[in-house]
Amino acid sequence: MPWSVDFDAATGVVQSVFVGELSPAELMAALAATIEASRNNESRRVLADCSALTTGHSLVDLYDAAVAAAADPNTLPLREAVLVPTSAEAADLVSFWETAATNRGLQVRAFTDRAEALAWLTGARP
């Protein structure tokens, strides 16, 4: 499985990690698992580590995921920090996700630095 979802009790952040190729079905499964972990742990803060993501899904898949996330009452308000992948193609997909999700009312921001992403999520200053 190219993704995992865990809850970090120390920071109160749901952490989703993506590695390699992520199919459209895996993207939607990861989204559902992230929303469930957010609900179960009463956290609206998500760190999506896409730094090792390559590709596997399309802009349409991301658009559909943004629509689904915004339509789920368990996601609002949601604050998600996304660690940008090193792959240029995957980085473009993250940029699209940031725009599509933000346009639907989610707070999404892309980062290249994990510490900065966590600081934004938790309100801490690095």
Mark where each language-model region is:
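Amphipathic, Lys/Arg-enriched alpha-helical "gate/interface" segment within cytosolic domains
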Residues: 1-126
